[in-house]
């Protein structure tokens, strides 16, 4: 029956074809001998027939003429090959697809095959239920079928329009195929189909958007690229409303790890901005996508995006030339303060951004605070690009921009903060400082924050000097207010505050002289409150920079210039200070760092110290102040006594400051304060600032309190007290009242039993000085009983286990031997036999015999 059908087909040509040529008849007869094998029951038989057909079509011969091939192809081969697409044998189906490919390529009118080819392809690729697997089980064959569909699109072009339903049904399924190569080929086919049938495709293009958006996130990057490019063509030649459906997916691909994918997004979006029919209505949605690519990490992507964006701007500029006539004819030059290393966008690009900024900003500002890090980073990178285009037109959106920057500058991601500081710099560059300062400073006045200070610093850094200079004093005054500069002791806050001062100094240079006091006040606060050493060092460097722009040699010269007003402000509340008061910390910094200028400010400094160091004040505060006072007293000539005026305040220091704090009170804190006071007294007496007479005055006032401190638990206090007494005795010589002099040595003798050898050695040294004072006294006989008692006690210690102590005691005894040598000899001989070693006693006796008695 099959042979009969073939014979009838050969004998009765189609009426539309007319009489066949001899080549066609010959080909028909050749094929008629092979076609019956396609109906064989056995798989090998059908396969042999298909192989024979393949050889017949591939070999040169009658089939080489497309016109001669068209008739037999359409009547004999096509129907049977399409039936073979459902053959149970995979090999037969593969050969059938290959033969269909050959036939389409050789046929003179391949479009004639579409009415039968497209439904057959759709049946094999789609099936009746889209959710189920396609009828064609072999993925390589599905790939071949999609390639065949693509070939039909290439060969037939617009002739596919009547068969779009079948083609789209096949593509909707193949775009979701499990096999990556099928998806990729389907994307190419969809793009080609859209381009081939633009007049009809737009009515059904939306049906492909869903499958394409599922494919756009495929794990293979080449599939993702193909899906993006296919989406570009489908929307370009289809329904532009689908842009809304793909925007979020395209935005997500901007985060793709593969640069080729990001490049595809830039290319497609740029193409839409140039060629999409209703592109004007989508500008505000597409511009952010393309501009985001300007910050891509790969140079090639950045260059492509920049080139496309410039083309978009120039095209729009040309299309709206009449509207832009004035701006084109009278275009102002590039602003002189335009950011360096930035190329100014063409007018069309700037106008596009400006006109769409009100629609772009709300979504962008929302995304900058998104919970996803990548979204925040990308959005923050886009904002400075928009501001660079908007220039001074950003003024009308400034409130929204600044509010966003305040929030975004608190981000933990450094990249977000970096982009936001760049945005703030551009605000300073293009917006009048009168406008942005009003908004920023009012916000800081209500709620001071580290992020607000960072925005202010960045804006000032971007502002031209001549624009910022009139506002310099107002800014510095506001920063110096306690509600801002003392709002937080957090190092980040203080670092941002420092950035504000650095910005003013770096931008305004010598103009900072009008606000030098306020800026120094802020820097002083930063140094006082900073917890990190590095931050204090930076603040110190900024002080040096401020001094340089003011034309003075160092920050100490700055202090000399402003120390009066600084101390007047800081000490205004000194009666209310505690250990944690910012003013106390500021006062401490001024005293410690002002150097010689401190000597000019004693009328402020000493009364403040007197009031704050009373026993009724906060103990921790007193400890801090004593520490600072000790430090400056050690360098008194270069600090507190630089003008030689400190001795005139000596009575206040000794009677009103040191004496009350040397009094004994119970508790560890009180003991620590006594130690601090003793240290301060030691610094005072050893500073070489006081004359001998002044030291004697100090001795007269404080010796009783110092003697009591020899009993302190603190080894350091006992040691320093010994040294102070030694200094007092050396200065007074024999001028000390005998009664007072006699009261000293018993306290020193007690220290020879101290647990600390250092204290014992210091006590021994002081006893040497005491004996020298006795030598210098007029009535030595008055001291005989005291000296005799001293001899006895010293001879006990001469047998000490510690050799160093023995040596020290021997020196004391030698020093005192000249007073009453006979008495000393008797006392020595009385105990020599009790000593573990008579060596030291013998040395002492030899010394007494060799040295004459003191007259």
Swiss-Prot record:
Keywords from the named record: Acetylation, Ciliopathy, Cilium biogenesis/degradation, Cytoplasm, Disease variant, Kartagener syndrome, Primary ciliary dyskinesia, Repeat
Example GO biological process: inner dynein arm assembly
Modified residues (N-acetylalanine): 2
Matching Gene3D superfamilies: Leucine-rich Repeat Variant
Alphabetized PROSITE patterns for the sequence: HEAT_REPEAT
Entry comment describing in which tissues the protein is expressed: Expressed in nasal epithelium and lung epithelium by ciliated cells (at protein level).
One MF term in the entry's GO annotations: dynein intermediate chain binding
Domain of life: Eukaryota
Acetylation recorded as keyword: yes
UniProt HEAT repeat ranges: 71-109, 202-240, 241-278, 280-318, 354-376, 377-414, 599-638, 696-734, 738-776, 784-822
InterPro entries: ARM-like (IPR011989), ARM-type_fold (IPR016024), DAAF5 (IPR052623), HEAT (IPR000357), HEAT_DAAF5 (IPR056497), HEAT_type_2 (IPR021133), TOG (IPR034085)
Location(s), subcellular: Cytoplasm; Dynein axonemal particle
GO CC, one annotated term: dynein axonemal particle
Function per UniProt: Cytoplasmic protein involved in the delivery of the dynein machinery to the motile cilium. It is required for the assembly of the axonemal dynein inner and outer arms, two structures attached to the peripheral outer doublet A microtubule of the axoneme, that play a crucial role in cilium motility.
Disease: Ciliary dyskinesia, primary, 18: A disorder characterized by abnormalities of motile cilia. Respiratory infections leading to chronic inflammation and bronchiectasis are recurrent, due to defects in the respiratory cilia; reduced fertility is often observed in male patients due to abnormalities of sperm tails. Half of the patients exhibit randomization of left-right body asymmetry and situs inversus, due to dysfunction of monocilia at the embryonic node. Primary ciliary dyskinesia associated with situs inversus is referred to as Kartagener syndrome.
Family, similarity comment: Belongs to the DNAAF5 family.
Complex formation: Interacts with DNAI2; probably involved in outer arm dynein assembly.
Protein name: Dynein axonemal assembly factor 5
